[in-house]
Regions:
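Short, flexible segments with low predicted structural confidence
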Residues: 1-3, 18, 34-36
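Short, well-ordered beta-strand segments in beta-rich or mixed alpha/beta enzyme
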Residues: 2-10, 40-67
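Glycine-rich beta-strand-turn "strand-cap" elements at beta-sheet edges
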Residues: 2-3, 40-49, 76-99
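Short, surface-exposed ligand-recognition loops at beta-strand->loop->(often short) alpha-helix junctions
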Residues: 10-18
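Short acidic, gly/pro-rich beta-turn/loop elements at beta-sheet edges
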Residues: 17-21, 49-51, 63-65, 98-99
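An amphipathic, aromatic/His-enriched active-site/gating alpha helix that lines ligand/cofactor pockets
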Residues: 21, 25-38, 56-90
Length: 99
């Protein structure tokens, strides 16, 4: 069964556009990772400095392996854009048409 990872990001004041560009560039790499079914970027309707990334993976392990493949310099770049650490949680599908 696939898993879904929900991630929340808050940009430093005035850095929302830069964080959006950064996340969009990372998503391109994530989508190409083994085990990734989908990866989408969302911006909050009421806050252009608040983003969510919704990822669907074959397994938690596939997600973790993809994360390890991100270059440390890219992670350091992200830290300069974030107001607080990103928050991510794994979910499993438990209801709806495909349950």
């Amino acid at each position: 069964m696939a898993i879904t990872r929900l991630n929340a990001f808050h940009a430093n004041p005035g850095r929302g556009a830069a964080l959006r560009r950064f996340l969009a560039s990372v998503i391109t790499d994530v989508r190409a990772a083994p085990g990734c079914r989908s990866c989408e970027l969302y911006e909050a309707l009421d806050d252009p400095e608040h983003f969510a990334v919704v990822e669907v993976w074959e397994t938690v392990e596939a997600h973790k392996a993809a994360g390890k493949a991100i270059a440390p310099a890219r992670l350091e770049e992200a830290m300069t854009l974030l107001a607080s650490p990103a928050v991510g949680t794994y979910f499993r599908h438990v209801g709806g048409a495909d349950a």
